[in-house]
């Protein structure tokens, strides 16, 4: 394991030149304090755990100090926001400090969010507030623990620096780790500004650095795009299967790697509601829970447009057409596993859709239903869960079909089924009210709850003694919390 001053940098994106990013130094925040750190994320850099306890750690990730090999850059990109094209966005408050590589040869971007003003800040102050930084940290690490591809979060550092949003708050910085920060909107920018050479350079960078195996194919860019489609189909299937709502699926928030990226007004479902909108600015529900699948396909079409100089329109359309069947296959596989089933059958889609309809009509807690279904032998669990449903007759019909489905598989014991289900059905998820409790304490200078919640979320499938309070439905005040893009 390494000390902070032993990180090795190889800043490949910075070497692309000033057309792709701008050299900017961070604006430090005052009296920095470490709020929370993720040892598993920092281990990606081979950093020793005790490094987070050093004063130097908070100084670096609050903008006060910098490695001599780092080359902080603000990246330029554009994007479709709520369906409308915005020609110039870019890192308005974040900096790509550099790319460090570990002993395994993996490159990781170190991106400091809340690092101050850049040429792309427009009218903003370049700051991130403590609450949004904590939310991004917790979401990144919670999704990773659930097995959902995501950028990682190394730490959050707080400060006494005041910033104004709806009220006065305090600035913070969050360290984001990802193997690339290239977005769909990065390629869109060079396509729509008619910079073909720069577009080709960026496309080659993505292909060479992140999809090198595609170079062996007859049409490398088509092979790369197909893999991007495949990765996004699997990603969105996991979002839907685990009840995650992103909230702002603009193309500038879509990673070229097919990972969850740029956390804003996200939420996990409490009660199952396919029409759930987690962003109170999304008045038309464009990014509602049920719309995430078609929006992901729409975003892939937007990316495809930027790739037309390299791939035929016909091939792009054919590849985009693979998204829905790939998504459906991944989603049904995940839902089978959540139900403890091991064999695919034609009626599985109906079994899942009927259950979700019953849950929708009864306001059943999405996460706890699946967990409790695996807590007992199936017949006993169904009798216990029956009281949660308004349509008792409908639920009894579904339960009968489910029991017949289990019996038809004839594989293993009830205990084996329960073990399988507990391995894929979390007991703990990042509910908005849990995040809000942690944020409220942190804003008073108490970081113990943020750290405790982080530790609970790191092992979501394992029951943790004394942590029963983190596996409860939200109290009345915690239901339907409205989260804005203000951060």
Swiss-Prot record:
The active site is at residue 252. Keywords: ATP-binding, Magnesium, Manganese, Metal-binding, Nucleotide-binding, Nucleotidyltransferase, Transferase. Mg(2+) binds at residues 253, 262. It catalyses: L-seryl-[protein] + ATP = 3-O-(5'-adenylyl)-L-seryl-[protein] + diphosphate; L-threonyl-[protein] + ATP = 3-O-(5'-adenylyl)-L-threonyl-[protein] + diphosphate; L-tyrosyl-[protein] + ATP = O-(5'-adenylyl)-L-tyrosyl-[protein] + diphosphate; L-histidyl-[protein] + UTP = N(tele)-(5'-uridylyl)-L-histidyl-[protein] + diphosphate. Its cofactor is Mg(2+); Mn(2+). GO terms for molecular function: AMPylase activity; ATP binding; magnesium ion binding. It comes from the Bacteria. ATP binds at residues 90, 92-93, 113, 125-126, 176, 183, 262. It is an enzyme of class 2 (transferase). InterPro entries: SelO. Its EC number is 2.7.7.-, 2.7.7.108. Nucleotidyltransferase involved in the post-translational modification of proteins. It can catalyze the addition of adenosine monophosphate (AMP) or uridine monophosphate (UMP) to a protein, resulting in modifications known as AMPylation and UMPylation. Belongs to the SELO family. This is Protein nucleotidyltransferase YdiU. It comes from Pseudomonas savastanoi pv. phaseolicola (strain 1448A / Race 6). The gene is ydiU.
């Amino acid at each position: 394991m390494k000390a902070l001053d032993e990180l090795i940098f190889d800043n490949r994106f910075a070497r692309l030149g000033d057309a792709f990013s701008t050299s900017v130094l961070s604006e430090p925040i005052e009296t920095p304090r470490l709020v929370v750190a993720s040892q598993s994320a920092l281990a990606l850099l081979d950093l020793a755990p005790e490094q987070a306890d050093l004063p130097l750690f908070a100084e670096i990730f609050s903008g006060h100090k910098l490695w001599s090999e780092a080359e902080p850059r603000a990246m330029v990109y554009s994007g479709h926001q709520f369906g409308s094209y915005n020609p110039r966005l870019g890192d308005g408050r974040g900096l790509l400090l550099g790319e460090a590589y570990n002993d395994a040869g993996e490159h990781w971007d170190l991106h400091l969010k809340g690092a101050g003003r850049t040429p792309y800040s427009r009218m903003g102050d370049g700051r991130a507030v403590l609450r949004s930084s904590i939310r991004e940290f917790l979401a990144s690490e919670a999704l990773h623990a659930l097995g959902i591809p995501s950028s990682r979060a190394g730490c959050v550092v707080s400060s006494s620096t005041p910033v104004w949003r709806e009220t006065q708050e305090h600035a913070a910085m969050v360290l984001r780790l990802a193997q690339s920060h290239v977005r769909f909107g990065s390629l869109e920018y060079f396509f729509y500004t008619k910079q073909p050479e720069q577009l080709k350079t960026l496309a080659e960078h993505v292909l060479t650095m992140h999809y090198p195996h595609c170079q062996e194919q007859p049409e490398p860019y088509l092979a790369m795009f197909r893999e991007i489609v495949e990765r996004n189909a699997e990603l969105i299937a996991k979002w839907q299967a685990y009840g995650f709502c992103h909230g702002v699926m603009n193309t500038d928030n879509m990673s070229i790697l097919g990972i969850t990226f740029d956390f804003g007004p996200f939420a996990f479902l409490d009660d199952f509601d396919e029409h759930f909108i987690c962003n109170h600015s999304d008045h038309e529900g464009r990014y509602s829970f049920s719309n995430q699948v078609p929006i992901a396909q729409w975003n892939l079409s937007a990316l495809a447009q930027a790739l037309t100089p390299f791939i035929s329109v016909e091939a792009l359309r054919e590849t985009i057409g693979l998204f829905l069947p790939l998504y459906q296959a991944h989603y049904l596989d995940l839902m089978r596993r959540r139900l403890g089933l091991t064999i695919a059958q034609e009626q599985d889609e109906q079994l899942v859709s009927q259950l979700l309809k019953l849950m929708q009509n009864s306001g059943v807690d999405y996460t706890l239903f699946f967990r409790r279904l695996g807590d007992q032998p199936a017949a006993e669990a169904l009798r216990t869960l029956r009281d949660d449903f308004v349509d008792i007759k409908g639920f009894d019909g579904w339960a009968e079909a489910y029991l017949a489905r289990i019996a038809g598989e004839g594989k293993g014991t009830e205990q084996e089924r329960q073990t399988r289900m507990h391995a894929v059905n979390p007991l703990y998820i990042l509910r908005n009210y849990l995040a809000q409790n942690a944020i409220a304490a942190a804003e008073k200078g108490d970081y113990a709850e943020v750290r405790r919640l982080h530790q609970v979320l790191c092992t979501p499938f394992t029951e943790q003694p004394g942590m029963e309070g983190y596996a409860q439905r939200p109290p009345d005040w915690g239901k339907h919390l409205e989260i804005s893009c203000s951060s």
